[in-house]
């Protein structure tokens, strides 16, 4: 019997994780199945118990369940503990749940390895202070940007995140007023605004000459945030598809101790992207 894996979230129909992990399994010669399971907020513990009873081996967790997963696991990696968000669970034979967060690794690998980007010494702006943001802050700071600024419509959330991650580097959090008279080499959108076709309130001149923009959402067409970057002189306007594949590759390694090649899967997904879904979350 192949080992069983799944991704849990709501909504889940859009998820490309089953396709990605099936491709990884074929590429590496691993015998496993991977499915998408819709789970409502507040029902994750029940869903995980049912999956364990079916001898499941591991789970990915997507929106809106990452914080709930963090509260449920028996043990988690230091980065997941600090992020207070879990996107990968290893189900031990004794029933223990081991949690991790691979989002930060996925973002940094996509930016640096796949696109030749640079974080070290750069002024970096992170938009949003939810689970998508908290999962990537530590990985960004470990690349030693000159300064990381987090802004959020509710400033207190960004301030709390900055305080939590201050041991890892120069970081400031607050409201969008922090952006006045400031400019950045790299702007990362960790909000869900692209899903609604909306833009965060960014002032003119916020992107430095030659700067990059990165939207954690992805789609067949450029997201509205990527288009904003293109019209404001971005040297590169990138979406989060590569991050999705890279965080999945890290999760696959945690489960199977085999590291798949991500580039062929990213290229395959680009070819197959459904035009009916212009923006999708990780």
Curated annotation (Swiss-Prot):
Source organism, top-level taxon: Bacteria
Residues binding NADP(+), per UniProt: 128-132, 152-157, 216, 240
Record: residues binding shikimate: 15-17, 62, 87, 103, 218
Entry EC number(s): 1.1.1.25
Matching InterPro entries: Aminoacid_DH-like_N_sf (IPR046346), NAD(P)-bd_dom_sf (IPR036291), SDH_C (IPR041121), Shikimate_DH (IPR011342), Shikimate_DH-bd_N (IPR013708), Shikimate_DH_fam (IPR022893), Shikm_DH/Glu-tRNA_Rdtase (IPR006151)
GO cellular component assignments: cytosol
Active site: 66 (proton acceptor)
Class in the EC hierarchy, top level: oxidoreductase
CDD domains recorded: NAD_bind_Shikimate_DH
Keywords: Amino-acid biosynthesis, Aromatic amino acid biosynthesis, NADP, Oxidoreductase
Gene Ontology biological process terms, A to Z: amino acid biosynthetic process; aromatic amino acid family biosynthetic process; chorismate biosynthetic process; shikimate metabolic process
NCBIfam families per the UniProt record, alphabetical: aroE, PRK00258.1-2
UniProt subunit comment: Homodimer.
Cited function: Involved in the biosynthesis of the chorismate, which leads to the biosynthesis of aromatic amino acids. Catalyzes the reversible NADPH linked reduction of 3-dehydroshikimate (DHSA) to yield shikimate (SA).
Alphabetical list of PANTHER family matching this protein: BIFUNCTIONAL 3-DEHYDROQUINATE DEHYDRATASE_SHIKIMATE DEHYDROGENASE, CHLOROPLASTIC, SHIKIMATE DEHYDROGENASE
Family under the similarity heading: Belongs to the shikimate dehydrogenase family.
Protein name: Shikimate dehydrogenase (NADP(+))
The organism of origin for this protein: Nitrosococcus oceani (strain ATCC 19707 / BCRC 17464 / JCM 30415 / NCIMB 11848 / C-107)
